[in-house]
Amino acid sequence: MFEHYLSLLIKAVFVENMALAFFLGMCTFLALSKKMEAAIGLGIAVVVVLSVTVPVNNAIYNGLLREGALSWAGLPNVDLSFLGLLTYIGVIAAIVQILEMVLDKFFPALYNALGVFLPLITVNCAIMGASLFMVERDYTFGESLVYGFGAGLGWALAIIALAGIREKLKYSDVPEGLRGLGITFITVGLMSLGFMSFSGISL
């Protein structure tokens, strides 16, 4: 059992990295990877949000939405899975709002550094994608807990690595036409190629 969860965690972080394998959450990934401090803050926020929303959405899906989930209420044939997207967005929005209030109260500097991108986590496709992958792969509650943490950790690892590279690029002689997003896209592409080396690993 432990080996299964460990392989699921490694797979979520490296083999199926949200940012570098599926290219999810690219908006905030590119916008907030200019400074290491902001990248670390957003990475931690994404880890927290995914670690909470994926298992919560798993419990809601298996307890209320999937076909036959309401058998306990005498409604064995009811299928509410069409409400999945709406429900997941609601859960994500609530968790992000709570996180925003906590950061505003206890970490105002980080809250100001993240700015508008913190509430944008609500519509970050990496956050939504993790919940949709969880449903598609029919994870148990325990698996969804590990997968949510791993997916967030993988995304955080990618943005922190990119931030480190971009800080070094400030002192490099980058051709004028590639400065800014141009060299950043090339860097992300090379990072993705690096992470492709994990794709042949069977876990």
UniProtKB/Swiss-Prot annotation:
A Gene Ontology term for the protein's cellular component: Gram-negative-bacterium-type cell wall
Coiled-coil regions, chain positions: none
An individual GO BP term: sodium ion transport
EC number per UniProt: 7.2.1.1
UniProt keyword list: Cell inner membrane, Cell membrane, Ion transport, Membrane, NAD, Sodium, Sodium transport, Translocase, Transmembrane, Transmembrane helix, Transport, Ubiquinone
Keyword check for Signal: no
Catalytic activity: a ubiquinone + n Na(+)(in) + NADH + H(+) = a ubiquinol + n Na(+)(out) + NAD(+)
Membrane topology: Multi-pass membrane protein
Bilayer-crossing regions: 12-32, 36-56, 82-102, 115-135, 145-165, 181-201
A GO molecular-function descriptor: oxidoreductase activity, acting on NAD(P)H, quinone or similar compound as acceptor
Domain of life of the source: Bacteria
Subcellular location: Cell inner membrane
Pfam family, one: Rnf-Nqr
UniProt cross-references to NCBIfam families, sorted A to Z: nqrE
Function in brief: NQR complex catalyzes the reduction of ubiquinone-1 to ubiquinol by two successive reactions, coupled with the transport of Na(+) ions from the cytoplasm to the periplasm. NqrA to NqrE are probably involved in the second step, the conversion of ubisemiquinone to ubiquinol.
Assigned protein family: Belongs to the NqrDE/RnfAE family.
Subunit structure: Composed of six subunits; NqrA, NqrB, NqrC, NqrD, NqrE and NqrF.
This protein's name: Na(+)-translocating NADH-quinone reductase subunit E
Species assigned in the record: Hahella chejuensis (strain KCTC 2396)
Gene name of the record: nqrE
